[in-house]
């Protein structure tokens, strides 16, 4: 079982915590991580692209000239695809790009991301995280005491308004609850700052 240091809000080590081997100690699977990230990014796409076909472009209801006798090629509408300003053939239409990987694959991806954080010493576990008021400076001081000066993902067991709103204005800092932990956020942040309660909650879901 991997062991990591347990810190308090002032940055002092107050003990150690054993992490579940089947959640934080698996061999990171890069292929599964890639699949999970692509799935999440696909779900974020708006999919609102649209072009007009020949039946949707304004005008073109009248035949531009008679069929025979003009010497020109026959035409039925000025909105045919070959005309400038005509409709688009097989153009993009609004669609949803979202899809879901199997649950086992999604879980393995999260386990791989969490394990890579442990492996790369990018995991910081707190005994607790509480702020008396909504103050950005207070949150900044907590992170500074933990030597977190880059992009970090802050995770607590349940929603904490003071922590969430205090972290909101800090560049590169994202707040999540334990049940919202996902591969994309884990990988795009350099550090994972997580409370002991949140670790237990994540292990309970993924173990």
From Swiss-Prot:
Quote the subunit structure annotation.
Answer: Part of the 50S ribosomal subunit.
What keywords tag this UniProt record? Ribonucleoprotein, Ribosomal protein, RNA-binding, rRNA-binding
Residue span of region Disordered = 44-77
Highest classification ranks of the organism:
Bacteria, Bacillati, Bacillota, Bacilli, Bacillales
- Bias kind Basic residues: ranges: 60-71
The record's section on HAMAP family has: Ribosomal_uL4_B
Q: Which PANTHER family match?
A: 50S RIBOSOMAL PROTEIN L4 (PTHR10746), LARGE RIBOSOMAL SUBUNIT PROTEIN UL4M (PTHR10746:SF6)
| Single GO term (MF) | rRNA binding
Q: What family does this belong to?
A: Belongs to the universal ribosomal protein uL4 family.
The role this protein plays is: One of the primary rRNA binding proteins, this protein initially binds near the 5'-end of the 23S rRNA. It is important during the early stages of 50S assembly. It makes multiple contacts with different domains of the 23S rRNA in the assembled 50S subunit and ribosome.
Its GO CC terms? ribonucleoprotein complex; ribosome
Q: Name one Pfam family in it.
A: Ribosomal_L4
UniProt name for this protein: Large ribosomal subunit protein uL4
The reply on keyword Ligase is no
State the superkingdom: Bacteria
Gene3D superfamilies per UniProt = 3.40.1370.10
Q: Which GO terms describe its biological process?
A: translation
């Amino acid at each position: 079982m991997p062991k990591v240091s347990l810190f308090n809000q002032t940055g002092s080590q107050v003990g150690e915590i054993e992490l579940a081997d089947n959640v934080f100690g698996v061999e990171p699977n890069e292929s599964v991580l890639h699949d999970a990230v692509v799935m999440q990014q696909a779900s974020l796409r708006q999919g609102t692209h649209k072009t007009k076909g020949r039946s949707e472009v304004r005008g073109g209801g009248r035949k531009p000239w008679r069929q025979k006798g003009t010497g020109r090629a026959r035409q039925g509408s000025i909105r045919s695809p070959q005309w400038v300003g005509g409709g688009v053939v097989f153009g993009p239409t609004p669609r949803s790009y979202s899809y879901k990987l199997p649950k086992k694959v999604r879980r393995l991806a999260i386990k791989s991301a969490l394990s890579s954080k442990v492996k790369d010493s990018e995991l910081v576990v707190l005994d607790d995280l509480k702020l008396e008021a909504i103050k950005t400076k207070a949150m900044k001081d907590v992170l500074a005491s933990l030597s977190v000066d880059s992009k970090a993902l802050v995770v607590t067991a349940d929603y904490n308004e003071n922590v969430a709103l205090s972290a909101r204005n800090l560049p590169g800092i994202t707040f999540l609850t334990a049940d919202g932990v996902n591969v994309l956020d884990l990988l795009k942040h350099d550090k994972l700052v997580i409370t002991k309660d949140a670790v237990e909650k994540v292990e309970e879901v993924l173990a």
